[in-house]
Amino acid sequence: MADRLEVLAAIEDGSTCVINALSKDQHLGTGGANYGRPGRISNTVNVPAGDLIDPETHVYRSPDQLADRFANAGADKESRVIAYCGGGIAASNDAFILTLLGYENVAVYDASMSEWAGDPSLPMQFG
C-alpha cells in the first residue's frame, strides 16, 4: 500500500511510475469531477483497468500485450510502481496484472482520488 505522502514524493522525484487505472476520460478530466476535482494526480500516466480486458473475449489480454501497455506507460520492473484510481478498486486490477508480469515493487494508493482530489493543496493536471 502507498499513502498520500509517498505518492506526493513519487510525483516530485520521478523515480516511481505512478499509474492511474481510471478511464482515459477520467484521467484527462473530461469525464466529470467524480471525486471533487476533475483530472489526475500530476505527473502520472494512464493504464485503464478496463483496457486490460479484451473487449471481444472478456478475458485479460495476452501477457505480451499487457507487458507492452505497462512498459509503454513507463513502468520498469526495477523501480517502484504505484497504481491509483478512485478508491483502490481499479488500481488493484492494474497491480494484480503487474505482479503477474513479474513486477516485485508494486503498491496501490488505496485512498486514491477520493482523498487526493478532496485536498486542494495537492497537485492535479487536467487535459
What are these language model-derived features?
Residues 1-17, 21-127:
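Rhodanese-like catalytic fold shared by cysteine-dependent sulfurtransferases
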